[in-house]
Swiss-Prot record:
Phosphatase that has high activity toward pyridoxal 5'-phosphate (PLP). Also active at much lower level toward pyrophosphate, phosphoethanolamine (PEA), phosphocholine (PCho), phospho-l-tyrosine, fructose-6-phosphate, p-nitrophenyl phosphate, and h-glycerophosphate. This is Pyridoxal phosphate phosphatase PHOSPHO2. It catalyses: pyridoxal 5'-phosphate + H2O = pyridoxal + phosphate. It is an enzyme of class 3 (hydrolase). Its cofactor is Mg(2+).
């Protein structure tokens, strides 16, 4: 049986936030104050819809967005990690669950030739309309009260595991690699054999620290990382167990 690796994208695979990164395409590399102030908590996808409309209205073309997105730096050690996983696909299945969008993730993976490492990508579907505006739709609908309305990563992960079970695919354990607040929900549902891998110093790490101080039990083990090389070391340890 294989190990399932679940990756976040922004600030995990890449070392920045792809949505805020493309603001460099705007005039003076910033958004108008009224657009900045239009964000409402839990409605990030809707906010980005307004940002993409603004960029289109300002004459920013698809090629400019692509050039910006494909210049995003990978997180330290991540290229080595993805290369390691490519060489060990017989041991690992890899999926991405991200609140970015399908176009940005496709561009990054395609430019770095890492598409083949990932079995499935779950994210907000995106496309360019006839006017050249990038439109992003919600990933799904869900009933979770802890997550933004467009994406509950725990729901997505649970549905993926169920579908794999229906195909007769079982995993020895799940390793969840992420950084953000929306990674807390799926991580708290991991089981005893599983591993939560929060990026050091980021929201997920800080939240799990607080939970342990408040004696809120976590079933899974927690392994903090700051470089993909540390993740490789832990995966090598797991497959030798």
């Amino acid at each position: 049986m294989k190990v399932l690796l679940v990756f976040d994208f922004d600030n995990t695979i890449i070392d920045d936030n792809s949505d805020t990164w493309i603001i460099q395409c705007a005039p003076d590399k910033k958004l108008p104050i009224e657009l900045q102030d239009s964000y409402q908590k839990g409605l990030w996808t809707e906010f980005m819809g307004r940002v993409f409309k603004y960029l289109r209205d300002e004459g920013v073309k698809e090629e400019e967005l692509k050039r910006a997105v494909t210049s995003l730096p990978f997180t330290s050690g991540m290229i080595e990690l993805l290369s390691f996983l490519r060489m060990n696909k017989d041991r690992f299945d890899c999926i991405i669950i991200s609140d970015s969008n399908s176009i940005f993730i496709d561009w990054v993976l395609e430019a770095a030739a890492f598409h083949d490492v990932f079995d499935t990508v779950f994210t907000n579907p995106a496309s360019f309309d006839s006017t050249g505006r990038l439109t992003v739709r919600n990933c799904h609908t869900h009933a979770c009260t802890r997550c933004p309305k467009n994406l509950c990563k725990n729901t997505v992960l649970g549905e993926f595991i169920d579908k794999q079970l229906q195909k007769g695919v079982r995993y020895t354990r799940i390793v969840y690699i992420g950084d953000g607040g929306n990674d807390v929900c799926p991580v708290t549902f991991l089981k005893k054999n599983d591993v939560a891998m929060p990026r050091e110093g980021y929201t997920l790490h800080r939240t799990l620290d607080k939970m342990s101080q408040n004696l809120e039990p976590m079933a899974s083990s927690i392994v903090v990382w700051s470089s993909g090389m540390e993740i490789i070391s832990h995966l090598q340890f797991l497959i030798q167990m």
